[in-house]
C-alpha cells in the first residue's frame, strides 16, 4: 500500500511573473529515497524550500503527513538547502552541541554518534574554519540528521565531497532509508543519484516529471 509522506498538489510559484514552479503534482512515499534531477535554475531549490515551509506558494498546496505546510511554522524536517553556516572558531562538536542546547533534545553521545555517521569523528575537535568545503558539508548533514527527523530534504548534498565522501554519504542515505526515513534529494548531477534513489523526477523550467 502506498504511504504518501509528502504530497505536492498543483503547486505553482512565480517571481515577478516568471514561473519558478508550474502546476507541480508529485507524491513522495514514506521510507524511500526520491531524487530530483535538473540543471541550476530549473526550480529544484524553490520546490524544496516550499516543501520545508521556507517559501510560500503562489497557488496550490503541499501536504506532509496529510497536513498543509504552513510557511515559517516549525517542521520536523532535517534540511540542507544552502551552504551550511557554522561558527568558525568553534569545533564541529561544539557547533552541534550549541545547536542542540537551543532545543535541549539530544546529548553528548548523540552528537558523537552523528559525527561518526558522517565520518567527522576524527575532526570533531577541530575548528570549523579549518574544515574543507566537503567537511562543512558533512557537518551540515550531521546537523540535519541529529534529531532523527522522519523527513530529510537535501539540496546538492554531495557538493564539495570527494569520491570517498560521496560513497560515504550514499551508504549513510541507504542506512537512513533502512531506518524508515523519507529522503528528498535534489542534484544537477545525474551521477549523484544514479543507483541511489527509489524514484527519480526531472525538473525543467519549473515542470516536474517522473523519469
Functional labels for PLM-detected ranges:
Residues 52:
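Helix-to-loop junction immediately C-terminal to a conserved catalytic motif
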